[in-house]
Amino acid sequence: MTDFVFIDSGVGGIPYMMRLLEKKPDSSCIYVADTANFPYGEKSHAQVIKCVTELVGKIRERFAPKVIVVACNTMSVNALEELRSNYSDIQFVGTVPAIKLAASVSKKRRIGLLATKATCENPYNLELKEKFASDCALVTRADGELVSFIEHNAFTASREECMKAVKPAIDFFRAEGCDAVILGCTHFLNFTDVFKAVCEPDIRVVDSVDGVVRHALEILGSSFEVLGSEPPLVDFKGVSPLRREGSGKPQVCSEGEPSPSLFITGFRDTEEENQYNVLCSRFGIQFGGLLSK
């Protein structure tokens, strides 16, 4: 069996896997990007459920995961209950907007949520707000263009290009008087340092990485000790500081796959396939290629 399988519409959720490996390097981990159905953020509720359910079926057969981390806010808020119902033999950990954390750091009581259209429009956000931030105003911004930019350009664009891509969203939240912005799409985590450079010092940037990883580790009986309030998760070019110099012999899943590995479900052309190879090289993980049906 594989300890953890991470799923997302693209490569945005990789920082979750890298953070878990920083905490527990001997874990067997597989990352599956459903690139054939990217982007998820513009799909209907029913479409998201259909795509994710089919994806998990393939993953279950191929990797026999103990835990699946749904490293995608859109997948989580739309399909998590369905997945738990359909695959009761697998433990699922979802990712949802870090509204509670944002409320704890906001002094103005105005919180920004940057996410996909599907996440922004999901009523679950209102439930989270009423439960954890009832005295705060929640300002949302759907930015599918930024998600697409990160998926296809994050690891080749210059820092200046990345900051230019992020700036319109932050200008919007600044004009709305927000002093905390939630990165409500896992793709944005690859740009954490870029967001901070554009936001700080007047706007705090928050995400759900440590909370999700803590939950995933606890399911398999491991503890999470916070190394710092703002750990060096992934630097600008997408290279985990831990993995940059290597971390010894790779783990192997019981199915024989090297761990950690990245699999995709489709690509547009050879150039795009090569981009995934480059990405894997920078993260220090194996590229498994296409996930077979």
Label for each model-derived stretch:
Residues 1-236, 246-293:
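Non-catalytic structural scaffold of enzyme domains
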